[in-house]
């Protein structure tokens, strides 16, 4: 979300927003929901724009990190949600809407024979790696340096390395990642097909997925 300089001065922020930011620091790690601007507190969104509590407008390039693909408060989405709310929202079992969506995805994506719904991209990547390992009966994953694949231990290998390392050695991007994970990830430089070919020649029989 950017419109102009993201570093807003105190005069651009209302007392209400300053208070909310201070409250956030007490109950949220680093005072924010994630890798977002610390002092911006969003009040509403419409289409591709959002407004903070102080009334400042931003172009929203994040769009909920993907889910708000059609923009905020889209009339058709609003209508569908309002229609469903009185009927319940989360059931953890099959429902007609989920089955219909799965059918539409399968029809739209030729290689998707079936669909598994999950709660986040991190979870989807974890399942994909697990299925690949089970099918291939191999343990290693090849990933590209700088590629974001969620917040799992495997996804956070060499995302934004803070120290130099020779390829294919992975560098963990967070504390708390077991050393054993490093042995299961092979890191390739981005946009270097020759390097990937070399790594596959060396480790191909151990790699379950790229």
Residue ranges of predicted features:
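Active-site-adjacent loop/helix segments that line or gate small-molecule/cofactor pockets in enzymes
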Residues: 9-46
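Glycine-rich loop-to-alpha-helix module at the N-terminal edge of alpha/beta enzyme cores
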Residues: 57-142
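PLP-dependent aspartate aminotransferase-fold enzymes
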Residues: 103-208
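Short, hydrophobic/aliphatic alpha-helical segments
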Residues: 15-23, 49-57, 107
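Short, well-ordered beta-strand elements within core beta-sheets of diverse protein domains
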Residues: 44-49, 67-70, 184-187
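Short, Lys/Arg-enriched N-terminal segments with co-localized hydrophobic residues
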Residues: 1-7
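Active-site and channel-lining beta-strand-loop segments
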Residues: 40-62
């Amino acid at each position: 979300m950017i419109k102009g300089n993201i570093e807003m001065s105190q005069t651009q922020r209302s007392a209400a927003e300053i208070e909310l930011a201070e409250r956030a620091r007490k109950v949220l790690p680093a005072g924010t929901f994630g890798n977002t601007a610390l002092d911006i507190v969003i009040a509403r969104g419409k289409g591709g724009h959002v407004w903070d509590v102080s009334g400042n407008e931003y172009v929203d390039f994040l769009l909920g990190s993907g889910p708000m693909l059609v923009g905020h408060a889209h009339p058709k989405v609003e209508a569908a949600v309002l229609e469903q709310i009185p009927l319940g929202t989360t059931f953890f079992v099959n429902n007609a809407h989920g089955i219909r969506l799965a059918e539409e995805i399968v029809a739209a994506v030729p290689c998707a024979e079936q669909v598994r719904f999950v709660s986040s991209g991190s979870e989807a990547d974890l399942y994909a790696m697990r299925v690949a390992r089970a099918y291939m009966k191999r343990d290693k994953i090849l990933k590209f340096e700088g590629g974001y694949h969620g917040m799992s231990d495997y996804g956070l290998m060499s995302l934004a390395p803070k120290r130099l390392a020779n390829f294919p050695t992975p560098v963990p991007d967070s504390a708390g990642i077991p050393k054993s994970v490093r042995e299961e990830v092979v890191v390739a430089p981005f946009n270097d097909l020759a390097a990937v070919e070399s790594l596959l020649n060396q480790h191909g029989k151990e790699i379950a997925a790229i």
